[in-house]
């Protein structure tokens, strides 16, 4: 099935050709090779327009002619198949979630990792962190074995549509034009997005998402969410949609000796946020030294709090699936099962019937995959 993220802005007359080009590439990306006639039928464009666009893409090396269609079931003259050259370009993808390490990869247009690298921050905040990131990107660019389409960066914090980091406290970045700064330093297009949004894009494009609406909950040093509804990434009026990690999950009404304990201070300055019980450091502390049965009970207690937080979101958005991105040994099993049961308890059947709650199939590479999609979408209109 051909699908793409729905444009978030109006398509102006001057953008029509780019939109048509995107439609052709989108079909080839998701549906595989087809003849010019097939492309015209599937996109609704005229054959003349498709032939013109295919000629342009052939000249750029983005597509290749693959020989004639098979004879079986074919009436009339066989067309020449055209396919996307997934090895024509590489993408530099960088994940900045880790407090100590930069994670990066060279990825082809199909999302396959060509090379993966890590580097340690000299200092994970401020201008030094930015300099470390720039050096890391240069090293990945130098390792590319074919032309680079662009650089995608999945950053913590609140990031606007222009790739400006409005606020990333753990990096001490505020109002930083990260995309523009890196583009000037590296000489290639750079696209920057929030790490949870990037994980949602990666799941949408490469992770086998079920339908038009999903939420990806990223669980690492912190907790965040990326949301796609009806094929559009939800960013909110302040570009801060998905900050579920800072919804209160434990408060003074909870028994101090109860399953999740008393509300704990959060890095945001408040207490009892979901992040204080669900972030990986908190989960690992909770199960440390416990036998399997007790560990399962501890994880189930966190799953209950997660379900309480997610239930109104599922009800409001009528999501098809919720995807947990993080270690499956902690997020799968009792935590996942309990969260799903609580969501169903607290919502009307019509809103949660058929809801899938699963752990990502992309593993720890979800934000890297999403960083690559930032470039695919920004440069080619493909997602």
Where are these regions (language model features)?
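Glycine-rich phosphate-binding loop and adjoining helix at the ATP-binding site
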Residues: 113-213, 334-345
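Short clusters of small/polar residues that mark proteolytic maturation junctions
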Residues: 68, 118, 170, 238-239
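Short beta-strand scaffold segments in enzyme catalytic cores
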Residues: 102-106, 201, 224-228
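Glycine-rich phosphate-binding loop of actin/hexokinase-like ATP-binding domains
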Residues: 212-277
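ATP-binding/phosphotransfer module of carbohydrate and carboxylate kinases, centering on a glycine-rich
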Residues: 1-118, 124-142, 146-147, 252-253, ...
């Amino acid at each position: 099935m051909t699908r793409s993220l729905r444009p978030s802005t109006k398509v102006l007359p001057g953008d029509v050709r780019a939109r048509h080009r995107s439609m052709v590439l989108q079909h080839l990306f998701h549906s595989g090779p087809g003849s010019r006639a097939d492309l015209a039928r599937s996109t609704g464009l005229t054959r003349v327009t498709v032939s013109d666009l295919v000629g342009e893409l052939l000249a750029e090396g983005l597509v290749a002619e693959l020989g004639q269609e098979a004879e079986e079931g074919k009436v009339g003259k066989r067309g020449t198949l055209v396919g996307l050259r997934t090895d024509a370009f590489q993408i530099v993808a960088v994940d900045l979630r880790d407090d100590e390490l930069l994670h990066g990869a060279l990825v082809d247009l199909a999302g396959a990792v060509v090379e993966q690298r890590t580097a340690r921050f000299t200092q994970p905040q401020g201008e030094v962190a930015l300099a470390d990131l720039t050096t890391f990107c240069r090293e990945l660019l130098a390792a590319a074995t074919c032309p680079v389409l662009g650089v995608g960066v999945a950053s913590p914090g609140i990031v606007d549509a222009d790739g400006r980091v409005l606020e990333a406290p753990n990096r001490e970045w505020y109002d930083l034009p990260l995309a523009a700064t890196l583009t000037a330093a590296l000489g290639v297009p750079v696209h920057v997005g929030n790490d949870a949004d990037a994980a949602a894009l990666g799941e949408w494009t490469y992770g086998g998402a079920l339908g038009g609406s999903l939420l990806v909950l990223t669980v690492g040093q912190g907790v965040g969410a990326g949301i796609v509804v009806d094929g559009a990434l939800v960013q909110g009026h302040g570009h801060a949609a998905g900050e579920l990690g800072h919804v209160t999950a434990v408060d003074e009404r909870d028994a101090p000796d109860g399953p999740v304990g008393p509300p704990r201070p959060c890095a945001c300055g408040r207490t009892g946020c979901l992040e204080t019980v669900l972030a990986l450091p908190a989960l690992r502390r909770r199960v440390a030294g416990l036998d399997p049965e007790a560990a399962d009970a501890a994880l189930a207690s966190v799953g209950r709090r997660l379900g309480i937080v997610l239930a109104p979101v599922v009800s409001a958005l009528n999501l098809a699936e919720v995807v947990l991105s993080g270690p499956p040994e902690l997020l799968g099993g009792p935590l996942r099962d309990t969260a799903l049961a609580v969501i169903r308890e607290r919502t009307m059947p019509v809103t949660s019937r058929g809801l899938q709650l699963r752990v990502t199939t992309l593993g720890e590479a979800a934000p890297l995959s999403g960083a690559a999609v930032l470039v695919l979408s920004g440069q080619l209109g493909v997602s």
